[in-house]
Amino acid sequence: MATITAGMVKELRETTGVGMMDCKQALSENDGNMEAAIDWLRKKGLSKAAKKAGRVAAEGLIGALTDGKKGVVVEVNSETDFVARNEQFQGLVKMIAQVALKVGDDIDAINAAPVGSVTVATAIADAIATIGENMTLRRAKLLSVENGVVASYVHGAVVEGAGKLGVLVALESTGKTDELALLGRQIAMHVAAANPQALDAASLDPELIRREKDVMADKYRQQGKPEAMIEKIVENGLKTFYKEVCLLEQAFIHDTGKSVAQAVKEAEGKVGAPIKVAAFVRYALGEGIEKQTSDFAAEVAAVSGQK
């Protein structure tokens, strides 16, 4: 039997929004397995979480930069939000994005790349020494197309091209680049707001689909539905699930009467050529990094019977 720690209960509560005692029971029933505990809570009707959500807990900035047919998004973390408002740090993030646009999204390659008379890694070290706070280049992603545009959107920008959330959208087309760029930015804004998990159903993690089907089937079995009916219900449920998590099937935020795929198809008239949404990337600052919260940890520890 796995030991259920206060940190595990805290993480599950933050992910699902379910009460601490239910979270502790879910973890106990599933031998400490976080994903299984989430599914257990969902089957009990206590949580609607589709999967473990990354909790935004780190500070710093997301930088996004595009240059026609390619674009890059980077995350540079700091210890406090105060540093994110520092002009030197903001300049560092934008410089790293410029370098990544040239050398690609491999972190080692970015750190080793020259910038002036030093490397990026040295520039980061110098900023740490000057500002007095630890910083790190956490991740980067480059998108490019042979024909078309890569558009970007930064939400909560504190300076041009840098903020709390950054999105890139790659559109493949031989049509008018100005119209493509406008559509790309609209889709990027949609991605920022709707947070799709995949481009389409075929791009979804098969394990995620399997889990979703399992949760739905078990839920309806508990309601006493006959097996012959459950299969059809689950099939319809998956269609709804896809509309919630797949970019092309989501209702377009700029016109909720149509899907993103339909909006793209309609835009082909203005663009003058077929359009394919080739890829997207969405970086939210600190997702997956957990900040220490001592008061809440103490509360959880008390419920868990730990000191």
Swiss-Prot record:
Residues 80-83 are annotated as: Involved in Mg(2+) ion dislocation from EF-Tu. Gene3D superfamilies: 1.10.286.20, DNA helicase RuvA subunit, C-terminal domain, Elongation factor Ts, dimerisation domain. Keywords: Cytoplasm, Elongation factor, Protein biosynthesis. GO terms for cellular component: cytoplasm. It comes from the Bacteria. Coiled coil: none annotated. It is found in: Cytoplasm. One of its GO terms (molecular function) is translation elongation factor activity. The keyword Cytoplasm applies. Belongs to the EF-Ts family. Associates with the EF-Tu.GDP complex and induces the exchange of GDP to GTP. It remains bound to the aminoacyl-tRNA.EF-Tu.GTP complex up to the GTP hydrolysis stage on the ribosome. This is Elongation factor Ts. It comes from Rhodopseudomonas palustris (strain BisA53). The gene is tsf.
